[in-house]
Amino acid sequence: PPGTGKTTLAKVIANTTSSRFCQINATVAGKKDMEDIVKEAKDALGMYGKKTILFVDEIHRFNKSQQDYLLPFVEDGTVTLIGATTENPYFEVNNALLSRSRIFELKPLEKQDIRELVLRAVYDEKKGMGAYGADITEDAADFLADVANGDARAALNAVELGILTTKQSEDGKVHITLPVAAECIQTRAVRYDKDGDNHYDTVSAFI
């Protein structure tokens, strides 16, 4: 499912194994992108002994030849492949890659988990947006956790939108109330894009 931390988990694995981390999205990446990554991975391994983790999001969007291209480099250790898909991998990923892989199914996050992330995003000054001096009502936090449907990114995007697009009250704070939360997760995202490039996706790093 979306928003369950697939990308972040891959980054954690790369960090804990002291590996280089490369990320591509199969919906837009072509063979040239993969060739460049393989070359860089070979150089890093040969010159510095540094392994490379290649994270391919939406790997089911690669066709058979694209998946086959990666196979020899997975086999010889040039790259460690982590693929993410919202589809059934047994139908969408080549058997040759599957036979060399372990499959982990990530479940949608529980409502309480998302609620905790929402509160952390609002109040944590180091890892969240606590420096903005915002607060969120209990019913708003519950609402976001409920309608996110297991997708933490959706809830966190709404939090960021609420903080950045809601006017401060007389007390100098931004109050994320239930109406604000409902508007942010449904319609305000369409109107707000700070740099024309999905600015509000940044808070998804919490996942």
Question: Where are these predicted regions, by residue range?
Answer:
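Walker A/P-loop
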Residues: 1-24, 39-42, 71-72, 76
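Short glycine-rich substrate-engagement loop in P-loop NTPases that contacts/grips substrate
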Residues: 21-53, 63-64
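Conserved AAA+ ATPase "SRH/arginine-finger" region at the nucleotide-binding site
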Residues: 25-27, 102-115
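Conserved AAA+ ATPase "sensor/coupling" helix adjacent to the nucleotide-binding pocket
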Residues: 38, 100, 116-130
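Short conserved motifs of the RecA-like P-loop NTPase core
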Residues: 51, 129-147, 179-181, 202
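Conserved catalytic/switch belt of AAA+ P-loop NTPases
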Residues: 56, 60-89, 95-99
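C-terminal helical "lid" of AAA+/P-loop NTPase domains
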Residues: 142-147, 153-168, 203-207
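Conserved C-terminal helix/linker of AAA+ ATPases
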Residues: 159, 165-188
